[in-house]
Amino acid sequence: NMKQKIYHIIIFLLFWFCGVAYSQNPKADILQQDLSGLFDNLSMIGILGEDCSRIDIHITEVRKMDSREYEIKGISRTRLSVICPFKGKVCVDSISSCSQMIKSEYTELDGFIYGYYSFAEYGDKRYSGTFSGSFKQGYRMSGQQIEKGRNEIAELKLNLSEYRGKWKSAKGLTKVCSWADEIIPDTPANFCLFND
């Protein structure tokens, strides 16, 4: 109904402001905390290459190395059957906060952290390569604790985890690659033709 549509539009605008409103100082303290929990156990789906091959990314282990750097371990799966373990790092370089906190029964988000990543696959040399690019990750405050943002309303089409970049094979072949928890970024306009 109309009320629900207006509610969804308002929520969308609030999320849009999140990405735009950068805070100056109090949020800098957040970056000093251990943010491992924001990355741990993430499962995302994405696309690899011009032909938009499906890729699944699962982060299995996270460890804080220094104030802004985290060691990451996980697995990638392409063609639904080729599984490669990977390890690497994420570096957090900035933070934004929502101009208004979003707290409801289904959605909790205080802002996003941003940075870059580099993950090297190991295992079968024919299939392994290196992922690199930039990311954003939603967070929420729970008392003094920082936790993953939460969204249970699929209609919002809101990514709480989003990675954009490239994959470079051991032989030097480079492919565009992006993945997320909800809506895959950078999909071509005719994406549905690939995936019908």
PLM region spans:
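Central antiparallel beta-sheet cores of small beta-barrel/beta-sandwich binding domains
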Residues: 25-196
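Bacterial Sec-dependent N-terminal signal peptides
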Residues: 1-27
